[in-house]
Amino acid sequence: MLTQERHALILDKLERESVVYVNDLVNVLETSESTIRRDLNQLDKAGLLKKVHGGATSLNTSF
């Protein structure tokens, strides 16, 4: 799966659920934990999500 495809799927899941977890993304996207973490870092730097311990949250989510 291409990086752009993974990013789109991560953002889609995040939009639906407000929170995504690395372990869930590993299973859904069938890729390694390090790849998911790298993707989350890239999306965080792009300002598309907020990385948290073990996953990420939507920027629209307030806890």
PLM ranges: what are they?
Residues 2-23, 27-30, 38-63:
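HTH-adjacent hinge/linker in prokaryotic transcriptional regulators
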